[in-house]
Regions:
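Structured catalytic-domain cores with a bias toward divalent-metal coordination
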Residues: 2, 10, 14-15, 20, ...
Length: 362
């Protein structure tokens, strides 16, 4: 398949290689020493697209996905971090929704922090999945007007989004666990991790454990729509979660820090890095109650994100431009104040906020 994970023969462009072995002898040893360590290590050379790293190395490249409208070859930015010692493989991807940049921010902060000589196993990273949406700051892939996280496991002969999904899913299938970094688009949302395989899935407990290890403080444990990576990958035996890193226009430093800490928790707990992880108790919701505007105007919220909600609590009110109250909305259920729209102006029936329901602790 043309867009499959491959070696360097399919190079798309002259992507700069990270060459720590040749540029930093103190850290990685001489070329001869590195070749010797490769021969002695049980860890193999690892490639993803045009990126290829020996044990103790990092490399970046491109994962082919076809051609653009002017016939230029197109690819996703990828990185391979290949540890000195054998171990598990972690797959990480970001920006399958093109306007969700916090995951890209996590990758940008995380990769320079990781020393492959101190790592057991391999990390495969796709830094930007929806490259077409990313380039124009759109949520969906503008080539086929598709939400990328509804296209998995993909089709190598299908639409643009299906081909991208197929190329990345082939990499996912090489992993022992996977993180699909998201956020609540440009709305306001708490930090949470999503378990999307469904409570009856044979990997549910493994996915929930991974979500608890990431430790955002909140978990949404609810079967997701068809086509989500966190639904498709568990069907192949790979525990996978969607960390949802708040919601922002652009990059949010607090959410990025939360994401980096979450990935480091996973790397430590699953044996990629030395150390111990102690996770706190987390709030889990298994459903949502959404609220729309009963009238047009401007919304004022009565609660902060993460607040506990009791049935009958006033959640928001709608006023006109002169401050006159037109409508008030109270909670129908108990739960957690989970997500809100970012802009205050609303039309009748327009989405305003969500309350996480059926709440317990895990």
């Amino acid at each position: 398949m043309n867009c499959a994970v491959g070696g360097r023969s399919g190079a798309l462009l002259d992507t700069p290689r990270l060459s720590p072995a040749s540029t930093n002898p103190r850290r990685f040893g001489s070329h001869i020493e590195r070749l010797k360590s490769v021969g002695e290590s049980h860890q193999p050379m690892t490639s993803l697209g045009t990126a290829s790293a020996a044990p103790g190395e990092v490399d970046t490249g491109r994962l082919p996905i076809g051609e653009t409208r002017d016939g230029a070859r197109a690819g996703l930015p990828v990185c391979v971090i290949n540890g000195d010692e054998a171990g598990k493989t972690l797959y990480i991807q970001a920006a399958s929704d093109g306007d969700e940049l916090n995951g890209v921010g996590v990758v940008r902060e995380l990769v320079p922090q990781l020393d492959p000589t101190e790592l057991s196993g391999t990390i495969l990273v796709v830094g930007i999945v929806n490259v077409y949406g990313f380039r124009v700051a759109e949520h969906r892939n503008p080539i086929d007007d598709t939400k990328m996280n509804r296209a998995y496991p993909g089709d190598e002969h299908g639409t643009s989004s299906e081909r991208i999904a197929a190329a990345t899913f082939e990499a996912v299938q090489r992993a022992d666990l996977a993180l699909d970094l998201h956020q609540g688009s440009t709305s306001r949302m708490i930090h949470e991790t999503r378990v999307r395989c469904g409570p009856r899935h044979h990997l549910h407990d493994e996915c929930l454990s991974l979500a608890k290890t990431f430790d955002c403080g909140h978990v949404l444990d609810q079967k997701g729509p068809d086509g989500q990576l966190a639904r498709a990958a568990p069907d192949e035996g790979i525990p996978t979660i969607d960390p949802e890193l708040g919601g922002a226009v652009g990059l949010d430093p607090e959410s990025i820090d939360t994401g980096v800490e979450g990935v480091m928790n996973v790397l430590t707990a699953y044996g990629f890095l030395d150390g111990e992880v102690t996770n706190g108790e987390q709030t889990r919701a298994t459903g949502f109650e959404q609220y729309g505007a009963p009238a047009g105007g401007l919304v004022d919220f009565e609660l902060d994100l993460g607040d506990s909600v009791e049935q009958g609590d006033r959640i928001f009110r709608v006023t006109d431009a002169f401050g006159r109250v037109k409508a008030e909305t109270t909670a129908d259920v108990d739960g957690v104040f989970w997500r809100t729209r970012r802009l205050p102006q609303v039309a009748t029936g327009e989405y305003v906020c969500s309350v996480g329901t059926d709440v317990d602790t895990v």
